[in-house]
Structure formats: structure tokens, C-alpha cells
């Protein structure tokens, strides 16, 4: 794995020698990577390469799979997220997740965003919660479209609006990292453009990691790109370098469409 010319001196997250197993099958093999604050990091690679599995290991979503086992070390601000003392609920508030398919709760738009802050004690009063909900919807670029519809069901929104609602839901609990697992794959081009614009706007506030099959999207939204193949991290570098001057032959073959 090549990771030359990376200057992430104070990473938000650091993975060292990470392996992920599902039963006897190894899905991730000895992956080490740093995720920087105020950067968008894209994970690319063909289907089944392990990029989504590795993403889910960054906030212990693999814990929900009975056969999954993770070894190695993953740190958030220097703290081992797999340590027995780690509060997984708090971890997932600090490292939020936006999934491939929009999955709003069967609740009102307001309650979709307000649920997390309420259970985490971030909004002691209704007035406080109103402020948190509005701020999250503004940051997600959705406030102007829904401010007069807050009591309507989140499932009544369009697909693109639902995905932005899910992003608002994630950022309402004031995370430090946002993980996005192919957030635009189920959306039309107009909705995709809005999500990409939102990613640019959020970059200065959060460390963002996005899994995408769309190499053009990775090139547009990220500053760092990691190429995965067969469960290994083949190459990690500045996005411009990965797409214009990859150091590994497998990376070049994938970027130029020879496989994938």
C-alpha cells in the first residue's frame, strides 16, 4: 500500500492493522489509514472490495453482525474505539453514519432530527430543541424547504430530501466525523448535486468519509482518496494524485476502467 506525500499530522481517526472477519471469511486485510479533520476522504474500489465493511468498522456498525470480528486498532482522537470502556452509543453520536438508501424514521420531520439530541440530553427544553432542529436542517440545506412542514412525516419527502434529512439527523447530535456509505446511489442527478454541494459546505465542520462507486464523484468532493481491492488498501493519497498519477498499477487499471 502506498501513502506517500500525506501530511495528516493530527488525524481525527487512525486505523492500524485492521482486519475484519465474517466467520471464517476475511473481508478486510491489514488496513492502516489516517482520516484528517476538515477533509473529505473517499473510499473507492469495485463491488465487494471491502470499502463499506471498513467504513462500518469506523463506528462499530459491524458489531450488529453476529459473525463479525474486528482486530487491529482504530482510534478517535487517540482513544481506542474498540476498548471495553468505550460507550458505543456515544461513539455513534460522535461518528455519525448516513446510509446508501435514505432511511428516515416513521416520525415527523421535526422528530427525525430532534430524536437524537433529545435522547443524548443535548436539548434540555423544547426551546433548546427547536434551535438544534433548525440549525441541523439549515446546515443540511433543507430548512427552507421544510420549515412550514415540520409536523409532516419524514417519509413523505422526496428521495433527495429524505437523504438530506438523514444528514440533518446525523449532524443534530454534533458529531465529529460523518461516514457516508454511497449516499447518492439511489438519487437522481439533481438530488446528487445537492448532496455533493452539501458535502462541500460541511467539510469545514466535520471529518467526512464517503464510500462511492462513482469515481467522478470522488474526484469532485474529496481531498484524499483510498483505493480498495480484494479487502486490501492498495493506495491512499491526495485525490488529484490518485486520479492523475497513481503509483500502483492496480489503481491505474481501476481508474482507467480496465476492471471494476
UniProtKB/Swiss-Prot annotation:
Single biological process term from Gene Ontology: phosphate ion transmembrane transport
Lipid bilayer topology: Peripheral membrane protein
GO molecular function: ATP binding; ATP hydrolysis activity; ATPase-coupled phosphate ion transmembrane transporter activity
Top enzyme category: translocase
Annotated localization: Cell inner membrane
Keyword Nucleotide-binding (UniProt): yes
Sequence ranges assigned to domain ABC transporter in this UniProt record: 13-255
Catalytic reactions of this protein: phosphate(out) + ATP + H2O = ADP + 2 phosphate(in) + H(+)
Keywords of the record: ATP-binding, Cell inner membrane, Cell membrane, Membrane, Nucleotide-binding, Phosphate transport, Translocase, Transport
EC number(s) from the headed UniProt entry: 7.3.2.1
Binding sites annotated in the UniProt record for ATP: 45-52
Record GO cellular component, one term: plasma membrane
Family: Belongs to the ABC transporter superfamily. Phosphate importer (TC 3.A.1.7) family.
Quaternary structure and partners: The complex is composed of two ATP-binding proteins (PstB), two transmembrane proteins (PstC and PstA) and a solute-binding protein (PstS).
NCBIfam families xref list: 3a0107s01c2
Biological function: Part of the ABC transporter complex PstSACB involved in phosphate import. Responsible for energy coupling to the transport system.
Protein name: Phosphate import ATP-binding protein PstB
Organism: Sphingopyxis alaskensis (strain DSM 13593 / LMG 18877 / RB2256) (Sphingomonas alaskensis)
Gene designation per UniProt: pstB
